[in-house]
Amino acid sequence: MYFVPSWYHGNEYKENEQYFYVRRAVTEFDDSVKQIQMFNRNDIMEYKILNLSYSPNFRHFLHRQSVFHAPYWSCFDAIQEIRRTKVDILSYHDLMWPEHTEFVYTPFCIVAYVNNMKYAEVHFGEDGNMIEVFLFQSEVMIRKNVYDDRGFLSVTIIYENNQPIYEQYLDGKGNWKLCHFFEDGHIEINGENPFYLIDNKRYKFNCLNYNSMESLIEEVFSTYLDEMTSTDDIFCLAMHVLHHDMLEKLFEKRKTILSFYQNRLELFDDAELKSLIQNTNYCIVDSKHKISLLEDYAEKKLPIVDITPFDTRADFGISQQLTVQNILVPIDTIEQSKFEELILLFAKYFETNETARVHFFTRNANWDRIDSVLNF
């Protein structure tokens, strides 16, 4: 079983680590996390994560999801020819600094000064690991270095007038592998090292210039599927608008399970997308009301199963000790009118069951309905 998650930052093939002092506005938990946790805990069958996003701190992410030892393949590790697998500690003291550098410790980052001029800012992730270093010239940022949690410089981004111009993805020795230009999104491959790595075997890129990051990822991912998987393998694909087109091309004749989660049910007029849904072996949704939406779109009955992302197994050893009845209500997708009806329903229920407790559950850190509930 292979899992292709949609762990992206917006509409970019990357998922950078968050600064430790920034409140997380979007939860990391999704359907892929839950499915992988199930396979990891129960030893159901062999599985592997196929990660298409640039994730320099992927090991820390897996650790936060309690699946640190989950087997995975990283598309960007293949592109950058990274062979390292273990987390390694890299301190800012290990970097090369100019003479007479003075470090000032602030609540948010470490600021380096040279001759009383700001030279750099060192930023850290949620686990205290160094993730980025901003470099300055005359108080203006000119470069951002992104560090991998395996202990090396992974990407360097060049700025002009405080705007990113291009970014270079590096190999484990600091040599640039590809250059991504932000203005039009095109990619240039280093002609002196035009290779990527699949299972310790080097393959040559088809060309040295690509119109987009997606076309580059598609080439490398296609090679991995051809060389490392068989047509009998099963792929659980987290549907996402960013990689719809790629999945339609690469998985047309493979065994697939399509997983739709929360707001990722984006159905639009696209013949290939409709064909992918019509021909899949199974669809997974997180609520029953999405079943009719999918079948109306596909214009046929589909093999669909709705699986809640929450752990609904009863733990009788704990449940029998509780003196209250806890009711968990996910509310992110509930309309205001339905939400008000729900409050009235619970109000009547509380009149007959004094032990009931309702817990409204949201993944939105900026949820603003608290006052409306209290003053209803």
Where are the regions that the model predicts?
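Conserved catalytic-core segment of nucleotide-activated headgroup transferases in glycan assembly
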Residues: 284, 288, 312-372
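N-terminal subdomain of nucleotide-sugar transferases
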Residues: 1-96
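Short beta-strand->alpha-helix junction loop in the catalytic core
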Residues: 262-264, 289-290, 303-317
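A short, active-site helix/loop in glycosyltransferases that binds the activated sugar's phosphate group
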Residues: 272, 276-302
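Short N-terminal targeting/anchoring amphipathic segment
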Residues: 208-242
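Membrane-proximal helix-turn-helix segments that form the acceptor-binding/catalytic region
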Residues: 221-229, 260-282
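Repetitive, compositionally biased segments used for assembly/scaffolding
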Residues: 92-213
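Active-site proximal beta-strand in glycosyltransferases
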Residues: 235-241, 247-265
